[in-house]
Amino acid sequence: MEGVQEILSRAGIFQGVDPTAVNNLIQDMETVRFPRGATIFDEGEPGDRLYIITSGKVKLARHAPDGRENLLTIMGPSDMFGELSIFDPGPRTSSAVCVTEVHAATMNSDMLRNWVADHPAIAEQLLRVLARRLRRTNASLADLIFTDVPGRVAKTLLQLANRFGTQEAGALRVNHDLTQEEIAQLVGASRETVNKALATFAHRGWIRLEGKSVLIVDTEHLARRAR
Protein backbone atom coordinates (compact mmCIF):
# COMPACT_ATOMS: atom_id res chain seq x y z
CA MET A 1 0.00 0.00 0.00
CA GLU A 2 1.31 3.43 -0.97
CA GLY A 3 2.42 5.87 1.69
CA VAL A 4 1.24 9.46 1.96
CA GLN A 5 4.54 10.83 0.66
CA GLU A 6 4.37 8.69 -2.50
CA ILE A 7 0.78 9.77 -3.17
CA LEU A 8 1.62 13.45 -2.72
CA SER A 9 4.72 13.21 -4.91
CA ARG A 10 2.50 12.14 -7.84
CA ALA A 11 0.53 15.40 -7.73
CA GLY A 12 0.80 17.44 -10.92
CA ILE A 13 2.36 20.38 -9.10
CA PHE A 14 5.41 18.28 -8.21
CA GLN A 15 6.14 16.66 -11.59
CA GLY A 16 9.59 17.47 -12.96
CA VAL A 17 10.69 19.12 -9.70
CA ASP A 18 13.77 17.98 -7.77
CA PRO A 19 12.63 15.03 -5.59
CA THR A 20 14.59 16.23 -2.56
CA ALA A 21 12.89 19.63 -2.72
CA VAL A 22 9.50 17.95 -3.10
CA ASN A 23 10.08 15.75 -0.06
CA ASN A 24 11.13 18.76 2.02
CA LEU A 25 7.99 20.67 1.07
CA ILE A 26 5.72 17.70 1.72
CA GLN A 27 7.10 17.41 5.24
CA ASP A 28 6.21 21.08 5.84
CA MET A 29 2.62 20.75 4.60
CA GLU A 30 -0.24 20.56 7.09
CA THR A 31 -2.34 17.38 7.11
CA VAL A 32 -6.11 17.60 7.54
CA ARG A 33 -9.02 15.16 7.80
CA PHE A 34 -12.64 15.75 6.80
CA PRO A 35 -15.60 13.41 7.44
CA ARG A 36 -17.87 12.22 4.64
CA GLY A 37 -20.24 15.01 3.57
CA ALA A 38 -18.10 17.81 5.02
CA THR A 39 -17.74 21.05 3.06
CA ILE A 40 -14.09 22.01 2.69
CA PHE A 41 -14.97 25.39 1.22
CA ASP A 42 -18.00 27.07 -0.33
CA GLU A 43 -18.37 28.78 -3.69
CA GLY A 44 -18.05 32.54 -3.27
CA GLU A 45 -16.02 32.57 -0.07
CA PRO A 46 -12.45 33.90 0.10
CA GLY A 47 -9.63 31.40 0.23
CA ASP A 48 -5.86 31.19 0.29
CA ARG A 49 -5.22 27.45 0.54
CA LEU A 50 -4.73 24.62 -1.90
CA TYR A 51 -5.29 20.98 -1.06
CA ILE A 52 -3.83 17.70 -2.31
CA ILE A 53 -5.88 14.59 -1.55
CA THR A 54 -4.06 11.65 0.02
CA SER A 55 -7.14 9.42 0.45
CA GLY A 56 -10.84 9.65 -0.34
CA LYS A 57 -12.89 11.53 -2.92
CA VAL A 58 -13.95 15.18 -3.23
CA LYS A 59 -16.56 16.66 -5.54
CA LEU A 60 -16.25 20.17 -6.95
CA ALA A 61 -19.58 21.80 -7.76
CA ARG A 62 -21.25 25.08 -8.64
CA HIS A 63 -24.72 26.14 -7.57
CA ALA A 64 -27.44 28.04 -9.41
CA PRO A 65 -29.41 30.80 -7.63
CA ASP A 66 -32.37 28.40 -7.34
CA GLY A 67 -30.23 25.85 -5.49
CA ARG A 68 -29.55 23.44 -8.33
CA GLU A 69 -26.10 21.88 -8.31
CA ASN A 70 -23.76 21.32 -11.24
CA LEU A 71 -21.11 18.74 -10.48
CA LEU A 72 -17.85 19.74 -12.17
CA THR A 73 -15.57 16.82 -11.34
CA ILE A 74 -14.68 14.10 -8.85
CA MET A 75 -11.16 14.15 -7.43
CA GLY A 76 -9.17 11.45 -5.68
CA PRO A 77 -5.68 10.70 -4.32
CA SER A 78 -2.88 12.91 -5.76
CA ASP A 79 -5.41 15.40 -7.18
CA MET A 80 -5.03 19.08 -6.28
CA PHE A 81 -7.76 21.69 -5.88
CA GLY A 82 -8.21 25.20 -4.52
CA GLU A 83 -5.07 26.59 -6.12
CA LEU A 84 -6.83 29.30 -8.15
CA SER A 85 -7.52 31.35 -5.03
CA ILE A 86 -3.79 31.60 -4.36
CA PHE A 87 -3.09 33.37 -7.66
CA ASP A 88 -6.42 35.15 -8.08
CA PRO A 89 -7.67 37.03 -5.00
CA GLY A 90 -11.28 36.63 -6.15
CA PRO A 91 -13.78 34.36 -4.37
CA ARG A 92 -13.83 30.58 -4.71
CA THR A 93 -15.33 29.58 -8.06
CA SER A 94 -16.76 26.28 -6.78
CA SER A 95 -17.60 24.37 -3.63
CA ALA A 96 -15.56 21.39 -2.46
CA VAL A 97 -17.49 18.66 -0.62
CA CYS A 98 -16.25 15.28 0.64
CA VAL A 99 -17.88 12.31 -1.10
CA THR A 100 -16.11 10.00 1.35
CA GLU A 101 -13.91 10.55 4.37
CA VAL A 102 -10.95 12.56 3.08
CA HIS A 103 -7.37 13.01 4.19
CA ALA A 104 -5.39 15.77 2.51
CA ALA A 105 -2.28 17.90 2.72
CA THR A 106 -2.65 21.65 2.49
CA MET A 107 -0.53 24.78 2.13
CA ASN A 108 -1.35 28.49 2.20
CA SER A 109 -0.45 31.15 -0.34
CA ASP A 110 2.66 32.38 1.48
CA MET A 111 4.12 28.88 1.65
CA LEU A 112 3.50 28.23 -2.04
CA ARG A 113 4.88 31.60 -3.18
CA ASN A 114 8.04 31.09 -1.15
CA TRP A 115 8.47 27.64 -2.62
CA VAL A 116 7.91 28.91 -6.18
CA ALA A 117 10.54 31.61 -5.58
CA ASP A 118 13.06 28.96 -4.49
CA HIS A 119 12.05 26.42 -7.17
CA PRO A 120 10.90 28.20 -10.38
CA ALA A 121 10.10 24.86 -12.07
CA ILE A 122 6.96 24.67 -9.94
CA ALA A 123 5.44 27.62 -11.83
CA GLU A 124 5.70 25.71 -15.11
CA GLN A 125 4.05 22.67 -13.53
CA LEU A 126 1.18 24.80 -12.23
CA LEU A 127 0.64 26.20 -15.72
CA ARG A 128 0.51 22.66 -17.11
CA VAL A 129 -2.04 21.61 -14.48
CA LEU A 130 -4.24 24.61 -15.30
CA ALA A 131 -3.86 24.03 -19.04
CA ARG A 132 -4.98 20.40 -18.69
CA ARG A 133 -8.03 21.52 -16.73
CA LEU A 134 -8.90 24.07 -19.40
CA ARG A 135 -8.66 21.36 -22.06
CA ARG A 136 -10.99 19.13 -20.05
CA THR A 137 -13.44 21.99 -19.59
CA ASN A 138 -13.47 22.68 -23.33
CA ALA A 139 -14.00 18.98 -24.04
CA SER A 140 -16.90 18.85 -21.57
CA LEU A 141 -18.56 21.85 -23.20
CA ALA A 142 -18.20 20.23 -26.62
CA ASP A 143 -19.75 17.00 -25.28
CA LEU A 144 -22.76 18.90 -23.93
CA ILE A 145 -23.35 20.35 -27.39
CA PHE A 146 -22.43 17.49 -29.72
CA THR A 147 -22.87 14.24 -27.74
CA ASP A 148 -26.20 12.68 -26.74
CA VAL A 149 -26.90 11.68 -23.13
CA PRO A 150 -26.09 7.94 -23.51
CA GLY A 151 -22.77 8.90 -25.11
CA ARG A 152 -21.98 11.25 -22.23
CA VAL A 153 -22.93 8.57 -19.70
CA ALA A 154 -20.57 6.10 -21.39
CA LYS A 155 -17.76 8.66 -21.43
CA THR A 156 -18.33 9.54 -17.77
CA LEU A 157 -18.15 5.88 -16.76
CA LEU A 158 -14.89 5.44 -18.66
CA GLN A 159 -13.42 8.59 -17.09
CA LEU A 160 -14.35 7.36 -13.62
CA ALA A 161 -12.87 3.97 -14.48
CA ASN A 162 -9.64 5.58 -15.62
CA ARG A 163 -9.41 7.46 -12.33
CA PHE A 164 -10.81 4.98 -9.81
CA GLY A 165 -11.13 1.61 -11.58
CA THR A 166 -9.56 -1.64 -10.42
CA GLN A 167 -9.31 -4.94 -12.29
CA GLU A 168 -11.63 -7.67 -11.04
CA ALA A 169 -11.91 -11.08 -12.70
CA GLY A 170 -11.51 -9.74 -16.23
CA ALA A 171 -13.78 -6.75 -15.64
CA LEU A 172 -13.23 -3.22 -14.34
CA ARG A 173 -14.68 -2.29 -10.95
CA VAL A 174 -15.45 1.42 -10.47
CA ASN A 175 -16.22 2.38 -6.88
CA HIS A 176 -17.50 5.88 -7.59
CA ASP A 177 -19.33 6.43 -4.24
CA LEU A 178 -21.85 8.72 -5.98
CA THR A 179 -25.62 8.87 -5.73
CA GLN A 180 -27.75 8.59 -8.87
CA GLU A 181 -28.39 12.33 -8.68
CA GLU A 182 -24.67 13.09 -8.49
CA ILE A 183 -23.95 10.90 -11.52
CA ALA A 184 -26.67 12.80 -13.40
CA GLN A 185 -25.12 16.13 -12.39
CA LEU A 186 -21.72 14.94 -13.57
CA VAL A 187 -23.20 13.92 -16.93
CA GLY A 188 -25.23 17.12 -17.21
CA ALA A 189 -28.65 15.52 -17.68
CA SER A 190 -31.74 14.53 -15.70
CA ARG A 191 -31.52 11.56 -13.35
CA GLU A 192 -34.29 9.76 -15.24
CA THR A 193 -32.47 10.07 -18.58
CA VAL A 194 -29.16 8.94 -17.11
CA ASN A 195 -30.76 5.99 -15.31
CA LYS A 196 -32.38 4.93 -18.59
CA ALA A 197 -28.98 4.95 -20.32
CA LEU A 198 -27.40 2.95 -17.48
CA ALA A 199 -30.23 0.41 -17.62
CA THR A 200 -29.74 0.06 -21.38
CA PHE A 201 -26.00 -0.54 -20.95
CA ALA A 202 -26.73 -3.14 -18.25
CA HIS A 203 -29.34 -4.86 -20.45
CA ARG A 204 -26.78 -5.12 -23.26
CA GLY A 205 -24.30 -6.73 -20.89
CA TRP A 206 -21.78 -3.89 -21.01
CA ILE A 207 -21.98 -3.06 -17.29
CA ARG A 208 -23.40 -4.31 -14.00
CA LEU A 209 -24.84 -1.83 -11.50
CA GLU A 210 -23.99 -2.68 -7.90
CA GLY A 211 -24.94 0.06 -5.43
CA LYS A 212 -22.40 2.88 -5.52
CA SER A 213 -20.14 0.97 -7.88
CA VAL A 214 -20.25 -0.15 -11.50
CA LEU A 215 -18.65 -3.25 -12.96
CA ILE A 216 -17.63 -2.55 -16.56
CA VAL A 217 -17.77 -5.88 -18.37
CA ASP A 218 -17.42 -4.71 -21.99
CA THR A 219 -15.09 -1.71 -22.19
CA GLU A 220 -14.88 -1.88 -25.99
CA HIS A 221 -18.60 -1.41 -26.62
CA LEU A 222 -18.80 1.29 -23.95
CA ALA A 223 -15.91 3.16 -25.58
CA ARG A 224 -17.60 2.96 -28.98
CA ARG A 225 -20.79 4.42 -27.50
CA ALA A 226 -18.78 7.24 -25.93
CA ARG A 227 -17.48 8.44 -29.31
From Swiss-Prot:
Database matches in CDD domains: CAP_ED
Top-level lineage group: Bacteria
Residue ranges of the annotated DNA-binding region, renumbered to this chain: 180-199
Positions of the HTH crp-type domain: 147-220
MF terms in GO: cAMP binding; DNA binding; DNA-binding transcription activator activity; DNA-binding transcription repressor activity; kinase activity; transcription cis-regulatory region binding
Purpose of the protein: Global transcriptional regulator that complexes with cAMP and binds to specific DNA promoter sites, causing DNA-bending, to regulate transcription. cAMP improves binding to specific DNA sequences, probably by altering protein conformation. Involved in the regulation of gntP and gntK genes, which are involved in gluconate metabolism. May form dimers which bind to the aceB promoter region in the presence of cAMP and repress the glyoxylate bypass genes.
Keywords: Activator, cAMP, cAMP-binding, DNA-binding, Kinase, Nucleotide-binding, Repressor, Transcription, Transcription regulation, Transferase
Induction section of the entry: Seems to repress its own expression.
Residues reported in the UniProt entry to bind 3',5'-cyclic AMP 1: 67-73, 82-85, 92-93, 137-138
Binding locations of 3',5'-cyclic AMP 2: I145, F146, E181, E182, I183, A184, Q185, L186, V187, G188, A189, S190, R191
Lineage: Bacteria, Bacillati, Actinomycetota, Actinomycetes, Mycobacteriales
InterPro entries named in the record: cNMP-bd_dom, cNMP-bd_dom_sf, Env_Response_Regulators, HTH_CRP, RmlC-like_jellyroll, WH-like_DNA-bd_sf, WH_DNA-bd_sf
The protein's name: CRP-like cAMP-activated global transcriptional regulator
Subunit structure: Homodimer.
GO cellular component, one term: protein-DNA complex
Gene it is expressed from: glxR
Gene3D superfamilies, per the entry: Jelly Rolls, Winged helix-like DNA-binding domain superfamily/Winged helix DNA-binding domain
BP-aspect Gene Ontology terms: regulation of DNA-templated transcription; regulation of glyoxylate cycle
